[in-house]
Curated annotation (Swiss-Prot):
This is Methylated RNA-binding protein 1. One of its GO terms (cellular component) is cytoplasm. Keywords: RNA-binding. Disruption phenotype: Defects in meiotic progression. It comes from Saccharomyces cerevisiae (strain ATCC 204508 / S288c).
Length: 306
């Protein structure tokens, strides 16, 4: 079967099978799958085109070609285009469009599938679109966004407020951190009282930056033998503890203001002080936001970071 390829923006494409499946005996499952794939494709295309001047020029050029060709058939050998020069093959298309040849005409089956589709906790899942978007943006940013992160039950979450971007970078490269005397005491107590297998996660934010910049796991209690001379005023910090950075990327405060902290007079997490503890459920939600938010991917590891 000949495939017809679009000369529109990258990843916006269809084939003749799509047209053939537009029949009266289609199930709701077919329609929802097609719509889901099309929406993901359009969202990703819009973001890529708007944020990449080169792609804008490519899209304009391709549209001009389409006009000149008029009604002539355009084959994939001539005008196939996708980011990273990956061929638009059937296997790639299946990530966005999935069709069933066994059409189920049972209304009950359709209704059951529709209810199941709506009940899925989609906001907790990382879709193919999000995974692919993050893979592409890793080339634009040095951000660290793991596809999966082990967060055991009864883990605890704390906000870390740093006065300096330099201190945060040195923490990343040296794998240690130290708070104030009071903050260190609070974190040490939390670490010692952890249930078996649980962890302590730290949400880092630099004062007056208007954003959070990453997540680190506390992997030791306070130690005297760690080198705190990496910071400008080592006498101020004294003891330190080991950390392992698990996420490095920015999340703007406006995306986090909806998370209210009961132990801090129901103020947003963005108004938290250093070592403010965050409820488990909110901590999980923020981790998911770090992992899945698919716009404005920047990190303090980028050369142009400000």
């Amino acid at each position: 079967m000949n495939q017809i390829w679009s000369t529109g923006p990258p990843n916006f494409y269809f084939n003749s099978e799509w047209k053939e499946n537009k029949r009266n005996d289609r199930t709701i499952e077919d329609s929802l799958r097609e719509l889901d794939g099309l929406i993901h494709s359009l969202e990703r295309t819009h973001i890529e085109v708007q944020t990449n001047p080169k792609l804008k020029n490519d899209v304009t050029a391709l549209n001009d070609i389409n006009k000149k060709e008029n009604k002539e058939e355009i084959t994939h050998e001539n005008y196939t285009h996708q980011i990273n020069s990956i061929p638009l093959t059937s296997s790639n298309l299946n990530r966005h469009f999935s069709f069933s040849r066994d059409y189920n005409q049972s209304d009950n089956s359709n209704n059951n599938y529709y209810r199941e589709y709506l009940s899925k906790p989609r906001y907790l899942q990382q879709s193919t679109k999000e995974q692919t978007f993050n893979e592409i943006n890793k080339r634009k940013s040095a951000a660290i966004i793991p596809p999966w992160l082990n967060i055991p039950e009864n883990s605890r979450f704390f906000v870390i407020k740093s006065s300096s971007l330099k201190h945060v970078k040195r923490s990343f490269y040296n794998g240690i951190w130290s708070s104030t005397h009071f903050g260190n005491k609070r974190l040490s107590e939390a670490y010692k009282k952890l249930n078996s297998g649980a962890k302590v996660f730290l949400f880092f934010s630099i004062n007056t930056s208007g954003r959070f910049c990453g997540v680190a796991e506390m992997v030791s209690d306070l130690k005297m033998d760690l080198d705190t001379s990496i910071w400008e005023d080592e006498q101020k910090y004294g003891k330190a503890f080991k950390v392992r950075w698990v996420i490095v990327r920015d999340i703007n405060n406006r995306s986090l203001k909806r998370f209210l902290i009961p132990s801090n007079e129901m103020k947003p997490i963005t108004h938290s002080r250093d070592t403010q503890e965050i409820p488990y459920s909110i901590g999980i939600s923020i981790i998911n936001l770090f992992k899945t938010q698919d716009s404005d991917i920047f990190s303090f590891l980028d050369e142009t970071y400000e």
